[in-house]
Amino acid sequence: MRAILALEDGSVFIGSHFGATGTEVGEACFNTSMTGYQEVLTDPSYSGQIVTMTYPLIGNYGVNPEDYESGKAQVSGFVVAELAKVHSNWRATEALGPWLEKQGVIGIEGVDTRKIAKHLRSAGAMRACLTTELTPEEAVEAARKAPSMEGCNIVDKIGSHPMTPEEVDALVTDRELPPVEYDLVAFDFGIKYNILRQLRENGFRVTVVPAHATAEEVLAMKPDGVFLSNGPGDPATLTDIHREVGALIGKVPMFGICLGHQIISHALGAKTFKLKFGHRGANHPVKDLRTGKISITSQNHGFAVDPDTVPDDVEITLVNLNDNTVEGIAHKTLPVFSVQYHPEAAPGPRDPQYLFREFKQMIASRKQ
């Protein structure tokens, strides 16, 4: 069956369908990771996006029950150069194509993903339509009518999934759980399972609360620390969350990742802006301005903190060596810090996992 990817600027790419059928719209973006497609597909941060994988062959190792980053596929569509016809992996339980069909995600193969990525890199991320039923002209028109990611609150659209500490513990299946050292409240803006695993494996008892939990509700739980998760959409739209997080800053140690980093930045008085085509891949070099250390990081974001708006009492700690955008901040006197990238990986390098230990050390210092 024919499938069409149409962009709002009139670009049309025609290929073959796999997965579900129908029509979906979203923001077209690209990911440069060679592996980790299942983690990408199930990452809530990709909600509302049609993702192009630049690696030429996708689906080689199938799908398995262990590599989910949420309970289901989250992307609006999936674009690959070639879908593997045969998958092979000892953990695999299903091929990628049939799994996407069950998940209701439309896929297209047989298109020039290098051309798509280069076009988005030059022209910027844009609205798109992926369809098995519209004409090219109709698909372009559908893309142009799709909502823009800028100004879009997707956190409320995907909803939150509160979890008890016991439910978080159940995510760690491959090793013995360490003793609990600290109680942590984690805000769910679209939290990845591997973040929860990393927090638990670092000695935190984790309770996951909804995105709109109030500062009063969180403080009533008497946590040793607060964590702000990743998530989709425009961080500037989450003004009520900025307010509640601002009310927590200084009262309890705080660590944020990705969208959580952007929310902390807003709560501290900074602003965010939309990147031309975003950072999505597993090989982004980040420099720690305090130590000079370089980490190779996994990233997935379309917005960034504007360095010119960072207040004087906040330090920019990390920058991206590709474009010099802000990758981390820390308050100069209060126990709060955040990073734009994903130290938990899944997929990607594990260089920055030390940040979870730094958070624990911050809490320990605070309690002394």
Segments predicted by a language model, with ranges:
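Active-site glycine-centered loops adjacent to acidic/histidine catalytic or metal-binding residues
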Residues: D112, C258, H301, H342
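Active-site-proximal beta-strand elements of phosphoester/diester hydrolases
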Residues: D183-F187, T297-S298, F337-Y341
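RNA-binding accessory domains that recognize and position tRNA/RNA substrates
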Residues: M1-E216, A220-M221, P235, A346, ...
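Catalytic beta-strand/loop cores that center a nucleophilic Ser/Cys/Thr
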Residues: G292-L334
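Cysteine-nucleophile active-site neighborhood
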Residues: D224-G225, S229-I296, A304, G348-R366
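Proline-centered loop/turn at the N-terminus of a beta-strand
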Residues: I106, D183, P253-F255, K271, ...
